[in-house]
Amino acid sequence: MKRVWLVIVTALLLSGCAASSSSNSEYSSDDIAFAEQMIPHHEQAIEMSEIALLNTTNPDVLQLAQEIKDAQSPEIELMKSWAGVKASTHAGHLMDGMLSESEISELRQAKGKEFDLLFLQGMIKHHEGAIEMAQKVTTSTNKDVADLSATIIKAQELEITKMNELLSKP
């Protein structure tokens, strides 16, 4: 009986190993490229949001920054869990909507209304870039990728509307 059990467990383990090594095929090269680019893109949005939490007293901007951070952190973890996705070794400043190091530095130095203006304008640009990236995989055959891209597009379009409203306030 122990031998039968051992054979069953071994077979299950081996089939599990085979499934995990072939799970790479669940994600196309476009899906992987999307995740590997969106991870540093989201990381920069979180960095910008963390700067906002320190550099503004505007309750609307504070709330927006926290919402961005809360939404994008789990999305990063989800994309990192996809088979075949490798950690990025660059800051991604050449991707759509990414702020340059000098723009991030300027954001760090700004306070008050000047900060709010730079943050909102920069985050709108950042979100527009993320939407462009996400639109490239909306038709992915992988449901996780298609669902995440749709979520990113919808959430960031709503946040752009909110940021434009904040910019129009006196």
Tell where the protein language model's regions lie, with residue ranges:
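Bacterial N-terminal signal peptides that target proteins for export
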Residues: 1-7
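All-alpha RGS (Regulator of G-protein Signaling) helical domain and cognate RGS-like helical scaffolds
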Residues: 5, 18-170
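C-terminal motif of bacterial Sec signal peptides marking the signal peptidase cleavage site
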Residues: 13-16
